[in-house]
UniProtKB/Swiss-Prot annotation:
It comes from Clostridium perfringens (strain 13 / Type A). This is GTP cyclohydrolase 1 type 2 homolog. InterPro entries: DUF34/NIF3, DUF34/NIF3_sf. A divalent metal cation 2 binds at H65, H224, E228. It comes from the Bacteria. One of its GO terms (cellular component) is cytoplasm. The keyword Transmembrane does not apply. The keyword Repeat does not apply.
Length: 262
């Protein structure tokens, strides 16, 4: 199957025009006419993932996070980014990334995280200007009230999360939840305005959390990796089911959270 045909499938599922303005998505490295027999799915294009692709003979790495986020001034082995790009080219491995467009789209990562947690479909926090059914973040009203601790236990069991950070009252009864996969602290204000009692996200920082905790918002920082990788595996099934039967779709074993707990 030609790479360009696979790209058309991905972009039909996650249209490029849904990406955020700061983002860079699409074909990062590659030849659209290349024949693809194996696709490796990963959250990030790490050196370990590139090695994994090389060893298994995968001609395409499909990631959520773009390798080329900002334009590099040079591509040399002096930098980590340069080494990765050179390794991809040397080993004839193509790289495609679908990021905030896949977060935003109806049925994408935001909606799928809501689904995995067993909540009803929510309203969109920040609607896309080009598609009223897409956008970043979801706010859901619970059909059955839950405490913060009960929601934490639900997240742990649903996503396989062992540890997470929280700010708030474990015994507070929650009626409305905001959910933003990945880095979501920029949406704390929106969550509060929309009446959320609690927000589930990753990558929060001290001062944001301190201020919004004082304002009465419970915060669950489940980690960037935990809020996206299990969700990406599920949502990528939509790509897998549309591939030709002779194309193998493989979930990376080297996709790992860079953080560890001690």
């Amino acid at each position: 199957m030609k790479l360009n045909d696979i790209i058309n499938i991905i972009e039909d599922i996650a249209p490029v025009n849904l990406k955020e303005g700061f983002d860079n998505v699409g074909l990062m490295v590659g030849d659209r006419e290349k024949n693809i027999t194996k696709i490796l799915l990963a959250l990030d294009c790490t050196e370990e993932v590139i090695k994994e692709a090389k060893e298994m003979g995968a001609e395409l790495i499909l990631t959520h996070h773009p390798l080329l986020f900002r334009k590099p001034s040079t591509i040399t082995t002096d930098t980590l980014l340069g080494r990765k790009i050179i390794s991809l080219i040397k080993n004839d491995i193509n790289l495609y990334s679908a990021h905030t467009n896949w977060d935003s789209v109806k049925g994408g990562l935001n909606d799928t995280l809501v689904e995995i947690l067993g909540f009803n479909k929510g309203i969109i926090m920040d609607k896309s200007p080009v598609d009223s059914e897409a956008g970043i973040g979801r706010v859901v009203e619970l059909t059955k009230e839950m405490t913060v601790l009960e929601i934490i236990n639900l997240i742990k069991s649903s996503l396989g999360v062992k540890n997470l950070r929280y700010a708030g009252d474990l015994n507070e009864v929650i009626k409305k939840i905001a959910i933003v996969n990945g880095s979501g602290q920029d949406f704390f204000g929106d969550a509060k305005k929309l009446g959320a009692d609690l927000i589930i996200t990753g990558d929060t920082t001290y001062h944001f959390v301190s201020d919004y905790k004082e304002m009465g918002l419970n915060i669950l920082d489940i980690g960037h990796f935990n809020s996206e990788w299990p969700v990406l595996i599920k949502v990528s099934e939509k790509v897998k089911e549309r591939l030709d039967s002779d194309v193998e779709f493989i979930v990376s074993k080297e996709a790992k959270d860079p953080f560890e707990f001690i």
